[in-house]
Regions:
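C-terminal-biased regions
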Residues: 1-54
Length: 54
């Protein structure tokens, strides 16, 4: 696994964790921010052929 792939997957995992935390805390604004970031990261992964878990 190259550095780009490893870094991208790490950012996705971190964002998923942050999204869960925002949901648990009831922070609707932060949920929207984190969801948008996650969507962007998943799009980037797809564009580069990086497989991401569901």
């Amino acid at each position: 696994m190259d550095a780009f792939t490893a870094g991208l997957l790490q950012r996705i995992r971190t964002t998923e964790t942050d999204l869960t935390r925002a949901r648990d805390e009831g922070d609707d604004f932060l949920v929207e921010v984190e969801q948008a970031e996650l969507d962007d990261l998943r799009r980037l992964a797809a564009e580069h052929g990086v497989e991401v878990g569901a």
